[in-house]
Structures are given as C-alpha cells and as structure tokens.
Amino acid sequence: MVKGLYTAYTGMLNQQNRMDVLTNNLANSATVGFKKEGATTQAFDDVLAYHIKDQSNPTNVRHIGSLSLGAKVGENYTDFTQGAFQTTENPFDLALSGNGFFACEYTNKAGVTSVKYTRDGSFILNQSGDLVTKDGDYVLDANGRHIRLNPQQETVFNENGTITQNGVTVAALQIADFTDYNYLEHFGESYYQPVEGATRKQADAKVFSGYLEQSNVTVINEMVELISVTRNYETNQKVIQTIDGTLDIAANLSLIHI
C-alpha cells in the first residue's frame, strides 16, 4: 500500500511538471519567436530496462522484491518548428525562414557580456544608431561587432543577411546555427544559449524584413492538453486520499483489537 502511495505521488510530480510546461507555453503564446516546450515521462519498465543494460556499476545489484514503482519525470525539450510570419511593414522587424538564430550581445546585472541567440527579430535603432533588441541588447554582425547604421538613410535588409544603406553594403547580420539543438537551453524569455558540446554550423536561413515570426504555440492544443493533465493530477490525488483513508481505517481497527 505504501508503494501505491509512492506510485501516485510520482504520478502527481510528473503531471505537475507537464502542467508547468504547458502554462509557460500559454503565457508565451504571443511572444515573438518563442518556441514551445514539451515534457517527457519515463515509465517504470523503461527505467528498469535501462538499469538492466547498464553495466557501468556491476555492484549495484537489485534483488527480487526491491522494485521502485511509479513514473519518472523525463527531460523537457524544445520544439523548434517555425512559427507563422506576421507582416509589420517595419523594415527593422526581421524574421528568419529556415534554421538559424540572430546573435545578440547580452549584458547581465554585473556588466558581464555574453553572446545569446534568438529568433525574435523585433529590432530598433538606439540613440547612437546601433541596431539593438527591444531590451537594448546589441545585435551582432558576422564578425561579432555591433551594427551601427545611419538613421537618416534608407536601410535595406537582404535575404542573405547583408545590410545596405543608399545602395552600399554597410554590414552583415550574424546568422548562427547549430548541428544539434539538444545542446541549446532556454535563457530568459526568448534567448537560447549553447551548452558544453554545442557545435556551430553554416546557417541556411533567409532574412525577411518587415515580418516577425510568431510563437509556434497552438493555444487550443495546449488548453486541451492542460485539461487532460489536470484530470490526471486529480486522479492521482484521489488515489492518495483513498489509500490514506484505508490506512486510517486499518490503524483504528488495530487499536480496537488492542
């Protein structure tokens, strides 16, 4: 019966994790360039099969009867499917068609800078004429430098990432891509940062000016999934309440016999 409590408890933890992911997706359904996340679950038999095949620690022998029932919360993942484009007619609003990210220079509260990557191309010019994000982070060129433009001249962003003013090429956007997106992790609202093992590759994305890539979250699908997760959570909760009631009855019966 205690195993039943543990099984229901792990089920609640799993559903809570899925609920957190879904609510975050819904909260960012209107965030430009946001990529939805998903949650995975490992069943007991999958975990058992993994440990049976794992020979890294031969002294860790599990004898008959020492079963750990329940569900194991797996890793969360990001769905990098491209979102729909929305027309803005603002030349500094950029969208990427294909795989790739804009490179930006992020500065933390301590003043330390680092390169982050984003699909959010809602850029502006600051007072100095630098191309920056809506939060003021510098957009980087192909050489990792800030992009300074003349606000008095017409600016054209070409599909290959080059920037021209009055017909003269003045800079080129840094469009980065990676061989395996599993080595990218969320940072803040719309940034991604590579982790150890991430490798760069040539990006094949095209730049479209006057458009913004919307979130790839489908609100209806997320709501339906959230309802299902909520019901599963409540089911596990009722199992725990039932077992708790049964244990309480058993304890009272033992007192009567005493």
Predicted stretch roles:
Residues M1-H257:
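Amphipathic alpha-helical polymerization modules
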